[in-house]
Amino acid sequence: MHREGHLDDAYWALRLSLGSTAFLAGLDKFTNLLTNWDKYLAPQVREKLPVSGRKFMYGVGIIEMLVGVGILTRTPKLASYTASAWLLSIAAELALNGDYDIAVRDVNMAIAAYALARSEGERQHASEAEYGEDAGLERVA
């Protein structure tokens, strides 16, 4: 397998794992099967919310599902940058709550999402260089 094949494998591993994790974590905000997500909401944050912590988590879930779908479908670059920023903000909130171990994991996932966004940009650039500006149209025709 050439270098491009290995890079393609890494790209798809990141894309599938980050996209499915974001979607499933978002979906779980409605079921709490994996964990009770409300316990991760820092009291300092909860008291400033205009809605209940539960309703806030529903909103978080919707955003996470949209980001997951974006990574898995037609907007992986934008969705990955969004996931990266989102995960960093979650890590900061977790640190406020003293959940440092989970915050560190979220920082690592944020870095992975950033790497995915960057590699998607490189893939787009390589595709345009190989097929021209109308790369998408030529491949469909």
Locate the predicted segments by residue.
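Membrane-interface extramembranous regions
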Residues: 1-141
